Regions:
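Helix-biased "structured C-terminal domain" signature
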Residues: 1-197
Length: 197
């Protein structure tokens, strides 16, 4: 982590980490980064977060996400926000700079040499909430994947008016055949009669 932060500093990119764990069993670290020499001209503010079994891994995940989204901070490229706010000015992000400083060691951890034990500890820490995992493994590729849902927690969707219905509707329109999409959209209309989508 120190080497990653030093690499940003060498390039003149400012980066700040923030605890976003919110009393959850897993540590979540947010990272906000900007290059003051190019901000507003050829670069933008990048805001990401990482969650992992340990605070250090969560921070590394957030910082590498900054690098992935921001490229080199000088190409006029824009990134698409992935669930978190996209700030145009540091003033919009001022709330991130407020609050106490905490050490990474003070964040929660479920770190264990056995990933199964990490998952069980995280699940236990989420009680009384229930987590559901939907298998999404591609049959030909055979690489195990899943989508995780915890009812009652915020749903990550790129819309100011986030909604599971909006997400399902978009997936229907993008991926289903016309008849299936129409049937699904009728069900959504019944479930969300006054929805904006």
């Amino acid at each position: 982590l120190c080497q990653l932060l030093e690499a940003f500093a060498r390039e003149g990119v400012h980066i700040m980490l923030k605890d976003f764990s919110l009393n959850m069993p897993l540590p979540t670290v947010a990272a906000i980064a900007w290059d003051p020499s190019t901000l507003g001209q050829s670069s933008e503010i990048v805001f990401t977060a990482g969650t992992a079994a340990s605070p250090a891994k969560a921070a590394i995940r957030a910082v590498t996400e900054v690098a992935q989204l921001a490229g080199d901070f000088c190409t006029n490229a824009c990134y698409e926000a992935s669930g978190l706010s996209k700030f145009n000015t540091l003033e919009e992000a001022a709330w991130l700079f407020e609050g106490p400083s905490v050490s990474l060691d003070s964040l929660p951890t479920v770190e264990d040499s056995d990933i199964r034990q990490e998952l069980l500890t995280a699940l236990d820490g989420l009680r009384p909430m229930t987590m559901y995992a939907v298998e999404t493994t591609h049959q030909r590729l055979g690489i195990p994947t899943h989508y995780t849902i915890v009812p009652g927690m915020a749903f990550r969707e790129r819309d100011r008016n986030q909604s599971l219905g909006l997400f399902v509707g978009r997936k229907l329109v993008e991926e289903a055949d016309a008849a299936t999409a129409l049937d699904g959209l009728k069900v959504l209309e019944e479930c969300y009669p006054k929805a904006h989508f």
